[in-house]
Amino acid sequence: MRVAVTGGTGFIGRYLLRELLGQGYEVNAWFRHEESRTGILEHPKLHWVKGCLEDAGSIPLLLENCDAVVHNALWRPGNTFRGTEGDLAKYTQINLGGSLSLMEIAAKRQVDRFVYVSTCAVHEKIMDDRPLDETHPLWPFSHYGAHKAAVEKFVHSFAFGHQFPVCAIRPSGVYGVSHRISASKYYDLIGAIARGEDVECKRGGKEVHAADVARGITYLIAAPRDAILGEAFNCYDRYVSEIEVARIARDLSGSRSNITGVEKSPKHEIDTTKLRRLGMNFGGEEQLRKTVKDLFEAVVNPSATRSIQ
């Protein structure tokens, strides 16, 4: 089976490439420029296709001989997902318009599976009288979340109206060792602990490891058609408080850092029953501890060579 991947050179995308190739899939992957592929090892089943959301002409090449598509790409002018959308008309034209072009061409080619990587930011205004599951209303605060919610509506129309086997996965906040190590979530906090500095921990968030997102996507590729048709799937592991990360790092390092702050907890937990029913499980505390250990080692030995693939 051959899978077309957009956004394969990014943070989640690199974990996805490794997971797909590790499971024996052939992969066609978009890349924007040569520098974006830095650190990704060559693989006989990995086929690069130059292209991007702005270049509709590259879509047929990406989809050539493919049985499935994972759409993970996002065009953004800033370094963060929210608040750096820039010109909203351009942002929407590229991301929404490009996503629809990709979906439409894939549907015309009768691709067997299309997985859209959405986000849990589609529901940021949360109601207290119901579970935070996939039936919860989509009320985003950001334009980023709004465009993801808009694409999800076309997931419904393509699936329910045209019987195209498309679905969406909604990762929460995502952590893990990034190919740009210093950009990894918790890197600065762990670095401060490694240096023996005192830290004050104030934040926490709903998190899932990038490797778990990648595995979740493969479950959606392999699931029966009727189980995914037009559906969205929450992808979330656990709430991670900064003070928990700091304490793990201190235990690993033997640091004398003084850690202050309180253990944060979520007001609403995200329900992941649907994805778990397909066989998915998450890395939990063990995955978190391994990631903190890997980041700590990167801080103390920054010259070590690492590759996501």
Residue positions per predicted region:
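Mid/C-terminal beta-alpha module of Rossmann-like enzyme folds, strongest
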Residues: 204, 214-219, 223-266, 306-307
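Conserved Rossmann-fold NAD(P)-dependent oxidoreductase catalytic core, especially the SDR/UDP-sugar
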Residues: 71, 97-143
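NAD(P)-dependent short-chain dehydrogenase/reductase
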Residues: 156-205
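N-terminal Rossmann NAD(P)H-binding glycine-rich loop of SDR-like oxidoreductase domains
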Residues: 3-23
